Amino acid sequence: HCRMDKSRLPSPIALTINQYPIQNLTQSQSLRDMMVEISLFFEKHSSATIIAHNASFDFNFAHSHYFQTLATDDWYQWKHNNNVICSLELLRAIYLFKEKLTTIEIPNSRFAYPQFGLEGVSKKNGIFYQSHEAEGDVKSLRDLYGLMMNEAPDIVSLAHSCANKQEAKR
């Protein structure tokens, strides 16, 4: 958990959506301390593959906060080993290239467009964790990623290969 800067007021909409306790906003660790912890975690696990739903959002968020807090001078640490897989893009690829989905159900909008957001896809597939909070989102992604591996192991394997620039060049 991370406390907010005392100079900022929380958005009432964000408080409602995220259901984040006010106590955590005032008493948890500072943003800088959290970003140092995140940097050390990624440094320790630098060879691991990062799987994130909407990875560009997460990367931009981390990059921006690394810069703002000066927690590390390695602002691009997620991208050094070319090991980021965006499960949102992977899910779109599975939807596009797999003729018939048998394991994963994709919800549609009111206008019959497929919706690939983590919360909606998770609910459609019977995965229920607290959304918009780290632990719940990680558990949802873990379960959804398992469904993707069952649905299209060849596409998931290709995503892992393409995440590595050396493999992608072949």
PLM region spans:
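Metal-dependent phosphoesterase signature
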Residues: 18-35, 41
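Metal-dependent phosphoesterase core characteristic of DEDDh/y 3'-5' exonuclease domains
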Residues: 1-20, 42-162
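Acidic catalytic cores of enzymes that act on phosphate-bearing nucleotides/polynucleotides
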Residues: 161-170
